[in-house]
Amino acid sequence: MKTSFSLDKDQAVRDLVRGGYAKIAEETSAGCCSPGVSCCGSAPQDADKLARELGYTKEELQALPEGANMGLSCGNPAALAALQPGEVVLDLGSGGGFDVFIAGRKVGGSGRAIGVDMTAEMLAKARRNVAFYREQTKLENVEFRLGEIEHLPVADNFVDAIISNCVINLSPDKPQVWREMARVLKP
């Protein structure tokens, strides 16, 4: 059972992370909780170079809306998830939409890619990018929702796959994140 002290501490962590990412969204610069630092170390000067090193293809990067790649990645979850056409994929901590837009192309018109982020500024950035994505792909299969990964705004047994890129580690209540993931995944 969590005490009021631990709940206050959890909220303080969320507020710190939310504030750091809000600043990044507003500055459109790379970094994690302070400019120039990602959750995996120093942020690169070239976000596309980092993405290529993580296995994103040149074609994937060129197809992204401007500003979606902020150099915050620590991996390539859409590739590792082996997403299939028709699947519903959920991205925890979707930020500017980088992995959601890539996942949306992989699941195609019969699938859906949903991004959840707790930072209104990141969601605004992602939502501004949706028009470009739809124009390029002719797909209407991506959406972004405001919420915390410990309390997902997603129905039970709704998604086929969950991806996340350097975000779960920032949660002060990881067991709750895993419970939420189990709740929203289809059996």
Regions found by a protein language model. Name each.
Residues 160-173:
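A short SAM/SAH-binding and catalytic strip from SAM-dependent methyltransferases
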Residues 175-187:
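A short glycine-rich, Lys/Arg-flanked "PGG" loop and its adjoining helix->strand segment in the class I
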Residues 86-95, 114:
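Conserved class I S-adenosyl-L-methionine
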Residues 42-88, 98-106:
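Conserved alpha-helix/loop element of class I SAM-dependent methyltransferases that forms part
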Residues 119:
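Conserved SAM/SAH-binding beta-strand->alpha-helix loop
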Residues 85, 150-162:
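A short acidic, Gly/Pro-enriched loop at the edge of an enzyme's catalytic core
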Residues 126-127:
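Conserved SAM-binding loop
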Residues 135-150:
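Conserved SAM-binding strand-loop segment of SAM-dependent methyltransferases
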